[in-house]
Design a protein with these regions (language model features):
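Aromatic-enriched hydrophobic runs in primary sequence
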Residues: 1, 44-47, 90
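Short charge-dense sequence patches
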Residues: 1, 35-41, 98-100
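Terminal targeting/leader modules
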Residues: 1-4, 24-30, 55, 94, ...
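N-terminal, intrinsically disordered, polar/charged segments of Gram-positive cell-envelope systems
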Residues: 1-25
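A broad structural signal for short, well-ordered beta-strand segments within beta-sheet-rich domains
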Residues: 5-12, 54-61, 100
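Mature extracytoplasmic domains of secretory-pathway proteins
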Residues: 24-82
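Extracytosolic low-complexity repeat regions of secreted or lipid-anchored proteins
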Residues: 64, 68-108, 113
Length: 113
């Protein structure tokens, strides 16, 4: 679903019931982390890039951070040339992994992370 946005920073908002959690290999109690190279962080990135039309190796990751609680995160990413800009929200689903919940197509990177 594509919706318009009232936010001047956001061109449109994408959501989809078809988006699935990125399958986790983590076991035991989930600990959210934002340390590059940690399995939880890498799974966050896999989930984020599964719903945008750019490849991780052709992108700039501006921020990945907590989105209000330990079971949610938000990232701002762009293509290397900065023509494609996105803010992606994900949520942790127990025993499944990180699931994308919303993509905002950004008009600008300024003030978005």
């Amino acid at each position: 679903v594509i919706n318009a946005s009232d936010d001047p920073l956001v061109a449109e908002i994408w959501t989809s019931d078809a988006w699935q959690a990125y399958p986790t290999v983590q076991t035991g109690e989930h600990q959210s982390t934002f340390t590059e190279g940690h399995i939880d962080y890498e799974e966050k990135l896999q989930s984020i890039f599964s719903v945008v039309p750019i490849e991780q190796q052709e992108s700039i990751i501006w921020s990945v951070k907590n989105n209000g609680n330990a079971k949610s995160a938000i990232a701002v990413i762009s293509s290397n040339d900065k023509t494609q800009k996105y803010r992606v929200a994900i949520e942790w689903i127990e025993q499944q992994g990180w699931k994308p919940v919303q993509v905002e197509v950004l008009n600008t990177l300024e003030g978005t992370y």
